[in-house]
Amino acid sequence: MKKDEKNNMDESLEEYDEENYTSELDDLPEYERELILAKRHEEYMKKKHRRMLLKNLHIDEKSKGNIHDDTNKSIETSNKRKGKLNNKKLKLKKKLYESDEEEENDKNDKNDDDQYDNTYQSDEDRKKSNNKKKEQSKKIKGDNESYNIDSISYVKYKKGKIKILEDDDEKNHEDEKKKTDIIDHVSVTDDSYTDSSYKNKKKSKYKKGDTNQTDKTSKKNKNDKTNKTNKTNVSIKTKKHREDYSDDSMDDYHSTSSYEHEKSSDVHYNKKEKKIQLKVISEESHLDNTKNKTGKGLNKILIEKEKKKKKKDLHIVDSVHKNKEDGKNVITDIFEKNEKINKDKELELPQTPERLIHLYKEEKKIKMDIYNYMTYDIITYFQLKKTFLLDMCEHVHFSYHVIGHMIKIIDISKLNKVTNQDVQNTNNKKKIDTANENKKKIFFITNVIKSEPYFSTDRNTNIKFEVAHLENLAHSKFFKKIKNIMYQNKKISMDEIKSNEYYETYICDMNNISDQKFTIDEYNHIKLFSIDLDVLKTFHLFLKEKNEDLKNFRYTEKQLQDLFEKKKQKSFYEIYTNNKSIDNLPITRITVQREICSIQREIDKLNFDKKKTNVNDTYTLSKLNNQINELTKKINILRGNLDKARKNHAAMKSNDQFAQEKNMTKEKSRTNIKSTQKDDATNKFLGVKEMDISYFSKQIYDEKTNFNNMLSSKFINLPLDVHHKVVHHFLLGTIQNNDAVFYDDPSHKIKKELDAEIDKLLGLHGNRHITLFDDIKKNYE
């Protein structure tokens, strides 16, 4: 084995600091930290084990001399024809070897120290050390030049070692150098298992140290096999055994070092030919490799990689900002680029724990890129709307995606088309195609605590959702199906939701919708599909359209209130000054009545203050009197305008009704009736006589009480079964004409009795106890 590797191993083990290794991992999470520390501990134990093995191996200097003698003998036998040349060359070799033996031992230690220091030195110190080495190499090269004789070339290297090369071998040697350089580049990328965020946190010192250690371990793992075979041959006593051992061990070692070269060439050599090809590995090639690993070469590689990554990130950000304006499919571009990079890396690298962490981080980065692209539109949407009610059905046809924890039914025309289609007409392809286009899956939330006219809340999730008004859903079959599912309390699975059936209306709880595919934004409480890119695209388009609509909409609620108040003030000003009528102004009679009430309250307050004031304080009393007089004038003006508006409204109504009656029935006027009676009739019909509001309110109250008393008396007289059935019918609000609901027994006697009772109760026939929606529609049409 080489002395260089031994010294490097010893120094790296002696200067192993736990503080330096753990300080870089403080920012990482526990799981990643433990994995990285475990890997480092394994490397440390391998190095320790290697050092123990190397301590047991003791190769004497005599064995070294015997090795070189054997190589010389093999050269002499192979080159008998060129004996004279070989003798000269061998003499040169011996002289150079003897002269540089002392320099070799000193430089080994220096080079080992330099190699270790390169990993932990700064850039300035490294430049100085490299300049010194170049000067030393120039001196040595000046003394010892390269000799080219015929086909064999003898090269003098730094340490005084000669490399014997033939013409064919020179090319292979150059190829071997190229391969080692390529392997060094690959080793850096293979061992860089962490992602860019982790690399940025690491210091430049520890980068270089880790790359050295990983490259050394890759070489040492190859040499483990040779050490295992040589364990038994450690105790060597005689010279013959030592010679044999030295020959075998060096053959094995050099065969492993030139393993890649043998792999590339298909020629099989004999043992003698192998001895000719034994190449004492030069110090220059070793130093070149170490420079690439630890010196400027590695720094250049790492700097170039970081620059490329920064350029990529900047390119992605620029493309995102550009495509926001252009409206391109940026989400797909980000996803496809990252996916290609991941696939290429997965083919090259094995799936180690560190690699899995790296993949997880990359996936997270993709999702964050997409989400960051969408955040601008999401934030603007919520700033404009300021509510979590998203009308998703307006622009995007989602089958079941609940976004913002809300469900809303809007497209009632489509809903009616779905419900009006019959299930039996599935054979006709045209009808199926039209139904699939108009089809929409509808979901109702059960488990309701409170029910307002348009909103209700879920019991389990406390979600407020909007309900479509039931008067607009004008089909009986639709409500029958809803009632049946309500009785069953059916819980729907994902498979049923995804099924492509023809007739689909469901009721389900929010809890039954699975949240596995959703990612929740904790800041805005939005649920988004992070897997399906189509959903993200459609949601993004929806947000853009909604933002444009909301930006075009100028007024908020406060602004509308301000506008309404301004209109009121202008209209009242015109009434007071120009004596304009209410009908010509944008004000209703209710607003005028409210204004009168508010003015009356102010007058009452002023009168109360007037009573409290002293009689001697004439100034305040005069002020109060003036204010009261002005307000009373305003009230009188408003009341006069109100009376005029009411009379005009009544006259308009009477004229319309009178015209309709004339067209319907044209009766002859009676000549015998007196004119006074005619006037009274016309005045009553036209509503000329003024009636007090209190009189009308009393009349309405009396009618209500009489009706309630009549109903309660009839309900008490009825049997309990009929009572329960009627109440059940009104509470459920079922819309159907089914005898099974009301009549349990098939006997006609009971039917007749019940018909008579219901006729007494409702004043209707037995078959027409409930009016259908179809009848209502006909009446309204």
Curated annotation (Swiss-Prot):
Region (Disordered): 1-27, 56-268
Start-end of Acidic residues biased regions: 11-27, 99-116
Basic and acidic residues bias spans: 57-73, 123-144, 170-188, 216-227, 251-268
Biotech uses: Possible candidate for an effective malaria vaccine as determined by epitope response in sera.
Swiss-Prot/TrEMBL keywords: Coiled coil, Merozoite
The keyword Coiled coil belongs to this UniProt entry's keyword annotation: yes
Protein name in UniProt: Uncharacterized protein PF3D7_1225600
